A protein has these predicted regions:
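Non-catalytic helical/linker scaffolds that mediate oligomerization, partner binding
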Residues: 1-500
Length: 500
């Protein structure tokens, strides 16, 4: 059995070589990127099980990210395997401003009172911490007395005790000993802030990524379906309507609007880092299970992300609780699990991918016994859906080694994946765009071949591609799914065939 759960690995300096130096060595950043050596490292990640690489546009400029994408293309050639490219937007966020003078950080004690300035374009001092808000918004009127302000992923908590309308400042009380450094993330839980759906920087980043031929966009801090629709409009305007959009759910508003967001997006990324700050932490696993269940029912992509193997940023082995976390995400029904800092700037990127692949593969063998997916509740709303359901029944009741789905758009393979058949799904596509769009779908192994000329050719091509893949051998039973006649645009045929 192949690994059916996909792995998203975030790229960064952890796998990049500069002037013969590894990340963390003196003078690393002053050296030029060694593309060939870096490509070898990334190829190793592919061989260990990485299916999609995430380019985090919260860090680095277009030149750096573009060079990184070029290196991944080199790595594809070295590994002899295609991967997906995912752009993760910076999104609308709040950060602490730069400090006056040479200060890098300020330390605070529990019970201290300081001020937080919401007026834009000023620098921070020890007594007045200024906020840099996406879209240059002044959030003074949006935050009520009694609200909590969390800095640097919640490492320091501040409580608003009063407001100074004249200066546009909050008076806050420090809730725990801690440090505030420049340009650290700020969260204000249970507060609706009227961010623009798409910041100017995100617009520029998305257009750049589309020019580079990316396959997926993860849209940060999605609150409503409109946020997804704005990105979709850019993709369609630039002739990139095929790019798949993942809505990152990171706050209460996104959770409240989850049904309409799922309908608008191609998938959901459950970004548990910011979510765990924006909502009560004990609700994060509840929301994870709820969202995955809804996404599964819609036949879309579910990606579970953030802190999955966090310990492996610094240590060669995961904790038992991290192993359980990854395992349970698979049992919940996730299509993909994601590595962030572990593969981007950690000490053990290769080991992190290998560990995640091992857990994913073990968990998928127990889906039938412990999995939460109940396909009997899915609606059969189309001929293709009926065929996809029949494919699962066939793999459950017969000795079927492989499902072969001939698909122009990829939709046939996606629907079959939705039902989680008991066999791998070989998606036979006719162009690389469709092939790469399937890199996140559970159980799908996408390949490219020439389009068959006739219906008879179609089934012969399916068998030949299956044999060539090494997934079956002579005498094995396969299920072939296709649309007849060729090019009809719909799936209406399922044929069980013994490989000759």
């Amino acid at each position: 059995m192949n690994k059916r759960v996909k792995i998203v690995a975030t790229l960064g300096p952890a796998v990049e070589i500069r002037g013969g130096k590894k990340f963390g060595e003196d003078g690393y950043w002053s050296e030029k990127l060694d593309c060939e050596a870096s490509a070898k490292n990334i190829a190793q990640l592919i061989k260990e099980g990485a299916n999609v690489f995430r380019f985090n546009f919260s860090h680095g400029d277009h030149a750096e990210q573009g060079e990184r994408m070029d290196v991944v293309r080199m790595a594809e050639d070295l590994a002899g395997q295609k991967v997906g490219f995912l752009l993760d937007t910076k999104g609308p966020e709040i950060r602490t401003e730069l400090f006056e003078g040479d200060a890098k950080e300020y330390a605070y004690k529990t019970g201290e009172q300081i001020r937080v300035a919401t007026k834009q374009g000023i620098k921070s001092t020890r007594d007045v911490i200024a906020l840099n808000v996406a879209g240059a918004l002044d959030v003074f009127d949006d935050v009520e007395v009694g609200k909590q302000v969390l800095v640097d992923d919640g490492k320091l908590g501040l409580r608003v005790v009063d407001k100074d309308a004249e200066k546009r400042e909050f008076i806050v009380e420090v809730e725990n000993d801690g440090i505030i450094a420049k340009q650290k993330g700020v969260n204000i839980p249970n507060t609706k802030i009227p961010f623009p759906a798409l910041a100017e920087r995100d617009n520029d980043d998305i257009r750049f990524g589309l020019e580079q031929g990316l396959n997926f966009i993860a849209i940060s801090f999605v609150r409503t379906a409109k946020d997804v629709q704005e990105v979709r409009a850019i993709c369609e305007e630039t002739g990139n309507g095929h790019v798949k959009l993942l809505a990152k759910i990171e706050n209460q508003q996104g959770i409240e609007n989850i049904d309409s967001i799922i309908e608008a997006a191609d998938g959901i990324m459950i970004a548990r880092g910011d979510m765990g700050i924006e909502v009560p932490f004990e609700m994060v696993p509840v929301y994870q299970k709820m969202i995955i269940t809804k996404v599964n029912a819609a036949g879309k992509i579910a990606v579970t992300a953030t802190n999955m193997l966090e310990t492996m940023t610094d240590k060669p082995r995961a904790t038992r609780s991290e192993v359980s976390d990854v395992f349970n995400a698979v049992i919940d029904g996730t299509d993909a699990t994601m590595l962030s800092g572990e593969s981007a700037n950690g000490k053990y990127p290769v080991e992190s991918v290998r560990t995640m692949a091992t857990i994913d593969k073990n968990a998928q063998t127990l889906l039938k016994e412990y999995g939460r997916l109940d396909s009997s509740t899915f609606g059969r709303s189309s001929k293709t859906e009926v065929v996809a359901s029949a494919v699962k029944d066939a793999t459950n009741s017969m000795d079927i080694k492989l499902v072969v789905a001939l698909t122009e758009s990829g939709n046939t393979a996606r629907l079959i994946s939705k039902y989680r058949p008991e066999a791998d799904i070989l998606a036979v596509t006719f162009d690389e765009i469709t092939q790469k769009s399937l890199m996140l779908n559970w159980g799908v192994i996408p390949v490219v071949t020439e389009k068959p000329a006739s219906t008879d050719d179609m089934f012969d091509v399916a068998e030949k591609v299956a044999l060539h893949s090494g997934l079956v051998e002579s005498g094995d039973n396969i299920v072939i799914v296709a649309g007849v006649p060729v090019g009809t645009g719909g799936t209406n045929t399922m044929r069980i065939r013994t490989v000759k």
